């Protein structure tokens, strides 16, 4: 008797969850040191003053202050944190 073994159905059936990337703190918002500002793949947004970069290119605040987004030459976007002492003046 000729038998055909059942084929696998591994091509379908996946709908992966989103990675929750993007801007977490927008311009003008206050941040505490350690707060995540942007989660990204690669350096779409670059780190400015008082902003650190994680292993996965996550940008986070190094000091307490206010977030500021800046447009740089060549269409680059940079994020900085203005410290509270300066922001209060």
From Swiss-Prot:
Q: Does the keyword Ribosomal protein apply?
A: yes
Query: Can you name a GO cellular component term?
Result: cytosolic large ribosomal subunit
State the residue spans of region: Disordered: 1-21
UniProt superkingdom: Bacteria
The reply on keyword Magnesium is: no
Tell me what gene encodes this: rpmA
Alphabetical GO biological process terms: translation
Quote the protein name from its UniProt record: Large ribosomal subunit protein bL27
- UniProt keywords, alphabetically: Ribonucleoprotein, Ribosomal protein
Tell me its family. Belongs to the bacterial ribosomal protein bL27 family.
Q: One GO molecular-function annotation for this sequence? A: structural constituent of ribosome
Q: Which Gene3D superfamilies match?
A: 2.40.50.100
